[in-house]
Amino acid sequence: MTTVIEFYISDKEREIVIEQLLEFFPKKKNCKDIEKGIYDFTKQYCKSDNSYLRLAQAIYIDCAKNIMFNLKDENNHTIKKIKKLIDKNKYNAYNLAFLNPEELNKDNWIKIIARKQMTEETLNQMATVEWKPCYACKNTSYHFYQLQTRSADEPMTTFYICKNCMKTYKVNN
């Protein structure tokens, strides 16, 4: 016997999302368009890999919460611009659900990318050593650093970071 799982989001859940969106948009039509976008995004996401069908309700709620979280953020200038365009009917509200996180909050993602680049630059400036093959990727090139993690009368702990897969190994000498 096989169980068939179909895509389903309850009408009650959809109405709740529309009511929550009314807090941010004066026109109910815009809220319905955004909700329809969230619904279609969830459906498209679940159809891309049928194993996600069981999670349809959770994916739908997560997408709705993500949009509302960004709408509540006072410092998010990108979403404020999009909201004004939606209110003036110059931007299709339906498309809001299909925006990537970096499109919903550009300022935050610029900071995240800059932090990641700085971390990579710091890693590239660290000392490099050839050591035993990495268990994950078989690479033998590592960055390493030492920290005094235990009492002063014991040797320092050496940390090796694989340059290829970034897996960290700790060695107590």
Curated annotation (Swiss-Prot):
InterPro entries: Rpa12/Rpb9/Rpc10/TFS, TFIIS_cen_dom, Znf_TFIIS. Pfam families: Zn_ribbon_TFIIS. GO terms for biological process: termination of RNA polymerase III transcription. Residues 9-129 form the TFIIS central domain. Zn(2+) binds at C134, C137, C162, C165. A zinc finger (TFIIS-type) spans 130-170. The keyword Transcription applies. GO terms for molecular function: DNA-directed RNA polymerase activity; nucleic acid binding; zinc ion binding. Keywords: Metal-binding, Transcription, Zinc, Zinc-finger. The keyword Metal-binding applies. Belongs to the TFS-II family. This is Transcription factor S-II-related protein. It comes from Acanthamoeba polyphaga mimivirus (APMV).
